[in-house]
Amino acid sequence: MRRIIIAAIAAAVVSACSSIDCPVQNSVYTNYALYKSDGGVDTLRDTLSVLTPTASGRDTLVFNRGVGLTSFSLPISYVNPCDTFFFGLKPQGDNTEWIIDRVVVNKTNEPRFESVDCQVAYFHNITSVEVTHNFIDSIVINNPKVDYDTERKHFRIYFSPRQ
């Protein structure tokens, strides 16, 4: 009888412990890879910054002064059906103006329930992308599924030919 009581107590203690593994950072990001018009990987020679408008009407800087990159990541909103970004490119040289392209990412949002103890995470499915063509020739959706995978490239950006 004593062994049964000890076994029951041990089972209760072990089952009371849980290992809930909530992600520390449950934000997801979209990854952009840069390509030349011939399909080869491109390296950003000029300075790139990206802003996004907020609900209050102000702009928020989400990527600042990237140079020498072949790829970069941007956050994506949780529940908005589309995200608007303003890509600003400052060509090399002291007296050059910023060139601005507007990029709109249309998407569906998929709430993901992981545990009662964790916040709801949102994954996304990219449905389309629109771009003005000031310095970006085109943006192609490479992989529409946005989740915790940080290695997956979601977009391929093809720049207009540069001098």
Regions found by a protein language model. Give the residues of each.
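Sec-dependent bacterial lipoprotein signal peptides
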Residues: 1-17
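Generic detector of solvent-exposed, compositionally biased contiguous segments
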Residues: 3-5, 66-69, 131-135, 139-140
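Generic detector of short, locally flexible boundary/turn motifs and exposed helical patches
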Residues: 14-17, 50-54, 121-122
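Extracytoplasmic cysteine-anchoring/structural motifs
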Residues: 17-24, 75-163
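Post-signal peptide N-terminal segment of mature Sec-exported envelope proteins
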Residues: 26-44
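A sequence/structural signal for flexible, mid-protein segments enriched
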Residues: 37, 49, 59, 113-117
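Tryptophan-paired
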Residues: 44-96
